[in-house]
Amino acid sequence: MADGGAEPPAPPSSINAGEFLLSILHGSPSPSSQGPQHHQSFALDPAIAAIGPTVNNPFPPSNWQSNGHRPSNHNPPSWPLAFSPPHNLSPNFLGFPQFPPSPFTTNQFDGNQRVSPEDAYRLGFPGTTNPAIQSMVQQQQQQQLPPPQSETRKLVFGSFSGDATQSLNGLHNGNLKYDSNQHEQLMRHPQSTLSNSNMDPNLSHHRNHDLHEQRGGHSGRGNWGHIGNNGRGLKSTPPPPPPGFSSNQRGWDMSLGSKDDDRGMGRNHDQAMGEHSKVWNQSVDFSAEANRLRGLSIQNESKFNLSQQIDHPGPPKGASLHSVSAADAADSFSMLNKEARRGGERREELGQLSKAKREGNANSDEIEDFGEDIVKSLLLEDETGEKDANDGKKDSKTSREKESRVDNRGQRLLGQKARMVKMYMACRNDIHRYDATFIAIYKSLIPAEEELEKQRQLMAHLENLVAKEWPHAKLYLYGSCANSFGFPKSDIDVCLAIEGDDINKSEMLLKLAEILESDNLQNVQALTRARVPIVKLMDPVTGISCDICINNVLAVVNTKLLRDYAQIDVRLRQLAFIVKHWAKSRRVNETYQGTLSSYAYVLMCIHFLQQRRPPILPCLQEMEPTYSVRVDNIRCTYFDNVDRLRNFGSNNRETIAELVWGFFNYWAYAHDYAYNVVSVRTGSILGKREKDWTRRVGNDRHLICIEDPFETSHDLGRVVDKFSIRVLREEFERAARIMHQDPNPCAKLLEPYIPEDNNGQGHN
């Protein structure tokens, strides 16, 4: 025995049970005699046997504890734990019915034995209205005597004897008033079950609360619930969630993610918005809370229709999705934009590829050759150069390099000393004169409501087409049409999110292109050989173009982040609109030509406003997270309750004209291109060495470094090469010079770029 006590004697058959009980109380043992046994028997204190029935327990008794450990104040009984009462006692000893001896060995579960309500709950039987249990009740009422000992019993896990059921029925009006079917529905559909069932939700809540308190106030390791690890690895019913949360249990792996992803995100709790908002203790498992958030969003999934995502972009809270690489997506869109804007033979070939392949009329060699050309064009510059060298084409350059050097831009950069002098120049005194002009330009770039309505019309149409073919696929809106930085006549960017590693994305895209063409959508082009398959189309009814890609989910999350930043301070949208308009006018907004994307320029504006003193924008990813999704191994979390931050930048009184001047002054003279990395994620400047983005021999990629907020290994400036970086910096210097000294800076700043001709004309 664990406590060193001696085993009490078994009751003799020659005395009655009352004398035996008195002998135990007076400490005078009586001689015992045991008859022949046909099965393994265990000693049992008859006083304990008289109090209530027992159950054959297939598990070690220590594992019944909620946390898998024996409490410190728990002393083992002075008798061996018995699994069946002595067969020689009176059938109705002390008025309680007794069991016949079990014919099964102790490692088997006697399905007809009686259990206490607590044992029933631990075994996973939440109620007593199960039809199987009720049938057993009726059988016990009809059979007054227990079955003969020689009768073979069926070993059915979960069945009870009549007395055990009666014991549970004694609590029927208490805190066990729901059956197993209701319990299963509660776990799958918590809100609908509570609203449609006739049970009192407070009863089940009190039941779980009482058991939680009895078990020490915690549920053991991980998500194992009240009974802990019971030796079989089964999960018990978790405690009910608080109002507004779902009980779906899918789980996240908190160990995933890179070191960069964990900065400012390693918190083990989440916050729900609304009437029932509550900050969870760090001991609560983050995966459970995230899945509750996911369930809450799924219940309101109609909110996330494609046309409604213009105002509410992003995956629902708690979603766990798969995404392609941001770098691969950028390469593919760069290629598609290049082909779409160049026009001519290449564009026609691109558009005919998908149609010929779908109809089966294309020559396989021609398709393969064209596919190799596309893939080759998406390779990194050094990889392309290496292939050309191997093929004996040493004089070959990428088309992007050729297009970025159509004139002599980039030859007029200032020296280091001149930049240092200009970096400390004060802003012009009359800068506020141009605020109204910049505001007017900003307002003229906002899409009209009629255009937004046309976009919604096209989105609803696309959603219906996709739902017919892939009912389980999700469509997400991303890009400028949803992040609040879109211009008039901007394309719509749609992500077709579908799970499954066995899905052939290229074939799926070809099928989608076929569906779109059959619905009379025009200019349907499919880029299937790129890293990220894309379909481009134009709606003849609305005149709006649309790009559809597969599983570019990270861009969807980034879209929500940008929109949330835009809600904090209107000066972000004003500055970003001016900068984007400048970049398009000056032709430094084409990634296939080695310049930056619109997304990169918006991140540059956000970072610039984070760095103002006092700051105009906070760093949302460094704040307590209220929004969480997982995209592959990247945990995307940040504070999205931006309504509380509307006055964050009120202490900074800089106007839009001052900010435009300061933005170009920073990127022309103050930014250290050799060592610095712009990081919106941290709201600070990082070093290239910290990111391992140092310049390497044969690779001039990290010349202007802009970190993606979530896929932190992705440098949005990697498209910039050693030629286009000079063009960019020269344009920044031109803009800073105009903002500092030009008498009409608003008009001069946004003058369209005109390439020089053979006579040297142009290049204003």
UniProtKB/Swiss-Prot annotation:
Residues 217-231 have a biased composition (Gly residues). Residues 26-41 have a biased composition (Low complexity). Residues 1-79, 185-271, 339-367, 381-412 are annotated as: Disordered. It is an enzyme of class 2 (transferase). GO terms for biological process: miRNA catabolic process; mRNA processing; negative regulation of post-transcriptional gene silencing by regulatory ncRNA; nuclear-transcribed mRNA poly(A) tail shortening. Its cofactor is Mg(2+); Mn(2+). It catalyses: RNA(n) + UTP = RNA(n)-3'-uridine ribonucleotide + diphosphate. It is found in: Cytoplasm; Cytoplasm, P-body. PANTHER family: POLY A POLYMERASE CID PAP -RELATED (PTHR12271), POLY(A) RNA POLYMERASE GLD2 (PTHR12271:SF40). UTP:RNA uridylyltransferase with a marked preference for uridine polymerization and a distributive activity for the first added nucleotides. Uridylates oligo(A)-tailed mRNAs to prevent 3' to 5' ribonucleotytic attacks. Reduces the accumulation of oligo(A)-tailed mRNAs. Prevents the accumulation of excessively deadenylated mRNAs to avoid siRNA biogenesis. Uridylation repairs deadenylated extremities to restore the size distribution observed for non-uridylated oligo(A) tails. Can prevent the 3' trimming of mRNAs still engaged on polysomes. Interacts with AGO1. This is UTP:RNA uridylyltransferase 1.
